[in-house]
Each structure stands twice: as structure tokens, then as C-alpha cells.
A protein has these predicted regions:
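H-loop/switch region of ABC-family ATPase nucleotide-binding domains
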Residues: 201-202
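The feature captures the beta-strand-to-loop junction immediately N-terminal to the Walker
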Residues: 40-42
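ABC ATPase nucleotide-binding domains
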Residues: 229, 233-262
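Conserved ABC transporter NBD signature motif
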Residues: 63-71
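Conserved switch/coupling elements of ABC/ABC-like ATPase nucleotide-binding domains
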Residues: 215, 219-229
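Conserved ABC nucleotide-binding domain
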Residues: 123-139, 157-162
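Helix-to-loop junction immediately C-terminal to a conserved catalytic motif
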Residues: 55
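Catalytic Walker B motif of ABC-type/P-loop ATPase nucleotide-binding domains
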Residues: 163-169
Length: 262
């Protein structure tokens, strides 16, 4: 059997704390190429920290994280950029750069770029942002900037196969009308190339309808690694300390929070 694409082997992450660093984990998780996994949990649970650990942006204080069987610490940055693309929650300010140059930053680590402008335009189209070509990034709305950054990550992974996409709240700043279309587009993009897609989300309905597995994180630990199926409802209620109602029709699943008794 082929190795998992990514493995966390009892990996811990030391976080600043008082009076001593408070470790997150240990995490023992794995995923394979082509899988779609949503990371869910309350605010402050450690979802973004887990994603940084998986990306190699925050090194493990104990245990290790393996990409294709090799510890992330042993990958050079250029080789790592060719195998995984990351969309963090906090984006660096791109000042007055034109949109197409921001998107092209995803291609920098790949060296020679025979696709050139074609890939940049196709990535912007996939993020429903073609009309932003030529605009200055710092003049865009928050939602427009989010789409450009999504296009940057897609451009980085455009001509790779069976890589890893790590995205942190990729659709948080977008209007509801765009969210479903872009989530469909991101999932289709990953599936067409065999990429594993891991997304930190707050939207339970996106997670249940667009992802196969759920990693439920609470207080820096894994509460559950489960399938995104109705049977996960009790675990989600435990995760958020609230009651949920599950609705289902031909269009998919919907989870509604129930008002707590006074």
C-alpha cells in the first residue's frame, strides 16, 4: 500500500503560554492524495495552528510531520512549494501590486514557468476573479482580495499532481452567493489533479456537503477524526457544546443550531 501523502506522528506544537509553553497535541493523523478534509472547532481551539504544523510553517516541538514519507524538516523550501500550497488566514499586505503579479507569486518557487500568463488567467477565472486583472491589489475589497489570494494558491498547484492544498478560512470574506460556487470550484480543482484538500472552516454546512472527513479540534486536541456523515452529529454537538438539528434533502445536508433552554 502506498504511503500516506501526509502523516502527523505524535506531533506536538509548543505555543506561548504562562507560566510555561502550552503544547498542542499530540496529533496522530494521516491523509492520502485526493482526500478532502475539513478542520472544525470553536474559536481558539487550535485549528490554524494545526494547519501551520501541517504546512511546516510551525515546526513540531515533539514527534514529526512527514510529507511523502520524509520529515518536513528535511525538505528544502523550493521542493516543498512544489508539493504543497498554503493559504493562511492572515495574508501579507501586497501594497500596490497589480493583481496578476500577486497571483504570479504562487509560481515563483517553481522556477521556469512555461504556462506563464495562461495559468495566471485560468487561476483567476477559477476563482471568479478574471475581471480583476490589471487592478491594484490594495484597491480591492476584502472579498476581492480573498479571491485573488485563492487564485494565487491555485496557480501554485496548477500543473502539479497529487499534492497538498492547505487553506485557512478561504471563503470567510465572501458573499453567500459566491461561497457555494467557489467551494465547488476549489473541490473540483483539487479532484482533477488528485490533490488532497484540507480546509479550516467555521461553516458546518460547507464541511458536511463538500468534504469527506472531519477533524474535530477542541482545546488543542483531536476530539474525533470522522466521516462527514449524519452520524457525526453527536460529535459536532459535543465539539460546540450545543444542540444541532440535521435537515436533509436532494440538495444535501443542513445543520441548524437549536436555541438553548433558559
Amino acid at each position: 500500500m502506498a504511503l500516506p501523502l501526509l502523516q502527523l506522528q505524535a506531533a506536538e506544537l509548543a505555543l506561548p503560554g504562562r507560566p510555561a509553553p502550552a503544547p498542542m497535541g499530540p496529533f496522530s493523523l494521516s491523509l492520502r492524495a485526493g482526500e478532502r478534509i475539513a478542520i472544525l472547532g470553536p474559536s481558539g481551539a487550535g485549528k490554524s495552528s494545526l494547519l501551520r504544523l501541517m504546512a511546516g510553517d510551525s515546526p513540531a516541538s515533539r514527534g514529526q510531520v512527514l510529507l511523502e514519507g520524509r520529515a518536513l524538516a528535511h525538505w528544502d523550501r523550493a521542493a516543498l512549494a512544489r508539493r504543497r500550497a498554503v493559504l493562511p488566514q492572515q495574508q501579507g499586505v501586497a501594497f500596490g501590486l497589480p493583481v496578476e503579479l500577486v497571483v504570479s507569486l504562487g509560481r515563483v518557487a517553481l522556477g521556469a514557468d512555461p504556462g506563464g500568463e495562461r495559468i495566471l488567467r485560468e487561476a483567476l477565472a477559477a476563482a471568479q476573479a478574471s475581471h480583476l486583472w490589471g487592478r491594484r491589489f490594495d484597491t480591492l475589497s476584502g472579498g476581492e482580495q480573498a479571491r485573488v489570494q485563492l487564485a494565487r494558491v491555485m496557480a501554485q498547484a496548477w500543473d502539479q499532481r497529487e499534492g497538498l492544498l492547505l487553506v485557512d478560512e478561504p471563503l470567510a470574506a465572501l458573499d453567500p452567493g459566491l461561497v457555494q460556487a467557489l467551494m465547488d470550484g476549489l473541490a473540483d480543482f483539487a479532484a482533477a489533479r488528485g490533490h488532497a484538500l484540507v480546509a479550516v472552516l467555521h461553516d458546518l454546512n460547507l464541511a458536511m456537503n463538500h468534504f469527506e472527513r472531519l477533524w474535530l479540534i477542541k482545546q488543542g486536541r483531536v476530539l474525533a477524526d470522522c466521516d462527514a456523515l449524519p452520524a457525526a452529529l453527536p460529535l459536532l454537538e459535543q465539539l460546540y457544546d450545543m444542540r444541532l438539528r440535521l435537515l436533509r434533502d436532494a440538495q444535501g445536508l443542513a445543520l441548524l443550531p437549536l436555541r438553548q433552554a433558559a
